[in-house]
């Protein structure tokens, strides 16, 4: 049996807004230069302005690209969650566990110009993708400014671009009635992490785009801004820095955007019309429907055909969890459930006692979600 969630016109989601919980980082992990998992913040970068006029295609031949054709599922995210639970003595408070990329697609699927499960082919746009990673290399340093040598700062153009190295933030957030645990890559930090856990962090999202010359260019850019906004909003990233490139791939300028004010700024320009509240409401209604629909075990698939007016949910395996949930995590949860000796003062909430659904980042066509475990 296939269940369907209807996608209606954006105006149908206008009106009363849905409550949103501010994303709070409770854990993190890193991938090193060889893309090896590390339970630390060793791959965190600091923002430092790039040099205008730099060729973003420089280093194309030495670019070290992560093989994203290998599906890593939720493995790293689950390892990080398990480590956090071992420290706190109880399960995380969440209904849904997934990567930011999945909710980015869901949040933007109400607009007709975005297709939920279809993205650009990296092999067709390799130069564009490489320029984005190059911009990150030019705009970041591995330590705070005062601890980084002048020689390193001035020679970032000669650094090998490597997208295997990543810092990933793990946050707890919420949309409407759904509490969500999200993991996602963060490009850089503006200053420093606050000493108090859960406080807002001045993260920076880095993007590149072609120069804007015409009204049509502006329209296309404002459409892109919706995706930029959703990505940043989900992880609590307050600042987006966009590098503009010429047709020859030269960095011609940099502009800073506030995540908070971006939806209003786009609406004032009256070009590509999108509403942040509509994105949030759509995501909230979808997550609520998803939680009610996945009411038993097995493996489920979430799919939206290109430009379809609905999202499909259907079961692909009657029992088990496929490869979504690792044996290591399942064994840890069994051990946790058998452990009757809770740490002093530990009182899990009703939401924490509930069994969350796991949704993994899909290959371009589909995503999968498992039922309760």
Curated annotation (Swiss-Prot):
A Gene Ontology cellular-component term: nucleus
Stated name of the protein: Decapping nuclease RAI1
Family: Belongs to the DXO/Dom3Z family.
InterPro entries: RAI1, RAI1-like_fam
Enzyme category, top tier: hydrolase
Assigned EC number: 3.6.1.-
Pfam families, per the entry: RAI1
Molecular function in Gene Ontology: metal ion binding; mRNA 5'-diphosphatase activity; nuclease activity; nucleotide binding; RNA binding; RNA NAD+-cap (NAD+-forming) hydrolase activity
Family annotation (PANTHER family): DECAPPING AND EXORIBONUCLEASE PROTEIN (PTHR12395:SF9), DOM-3 RELATED (PTHR12395)
């Amino acid at each position: 049996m296939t269940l369907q969630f209807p996608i209606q016109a954006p105006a149908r989601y206008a009106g009363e807004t849905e409550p949103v919980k501010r994303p709070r980082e409770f854990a993190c992990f890193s991938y090193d230069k060889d893309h090896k998992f590390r339970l630390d913040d060793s791959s965190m970068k600091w923002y430092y302005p790039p040099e205008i006029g730099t060729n973003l295609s420089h280093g194309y031949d030495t670019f070290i690209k992560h093989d994203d054709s290998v599906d890593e599922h939720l493995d790293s995210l689950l390892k990080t969650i398990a480590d956090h639970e071992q420290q706190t003595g109880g399960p995380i408070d969440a209904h849904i566990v997934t990567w930011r990329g999945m909710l980015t697609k869901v949040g933007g699927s109400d607009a007709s110009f975005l297709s939920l499960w279809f993205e650009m082919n990296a092999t067709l746009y390799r130069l564009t993708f490489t320029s984005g990673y190059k911009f990150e290399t030019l705009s970041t340093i591995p330590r705070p400014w005062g601890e980084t040598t002048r020689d390193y700062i001035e020679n970032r153009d000669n650094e090998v671009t490597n997208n295997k190295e990543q810092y990933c933030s793990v946050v707890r957030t919420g949309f409407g009635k759904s509490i969500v645990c999200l993991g996602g890559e963060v490009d850089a930090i503006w200053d420093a992490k606050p000493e108090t856990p859960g406080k807002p962090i001045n993260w920076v999202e880095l993007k590149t785009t072609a120069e804007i010359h015409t009204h049509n260019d502006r329209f296309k850019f404002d459409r892109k801004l919706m995706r930029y906004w959703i990505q940043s909003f989900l992880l609590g990233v307050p600042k987006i820095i966009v590098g503009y490139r010429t047709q020859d791939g030269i960095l011609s300028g940099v502009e800073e955007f506030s995540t908070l004010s971006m939806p209003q700024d786009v609406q004032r320009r009256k070009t590509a019309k999108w509403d942040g509240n509509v994105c949030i409401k759509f995501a909230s209604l979808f997550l609520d429907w998803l939680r009610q629909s996945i009411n038993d075990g097995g493996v489920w698939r979430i799919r939206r055909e290109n430009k379809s007016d609905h999202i499909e949910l259907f079961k692909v395996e009657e029992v088990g969890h496929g490869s979504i949930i690792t044996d290591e995590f399942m064994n840890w949860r069994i051990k946790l459930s058998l452990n009757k000796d809770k740490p002093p003062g530990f009182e899990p909430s009703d939401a924490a006692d509930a069994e969350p659904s796991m949704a993994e980042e899909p290959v371009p066509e589909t995503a999968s979600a498992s039922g309760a475990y």
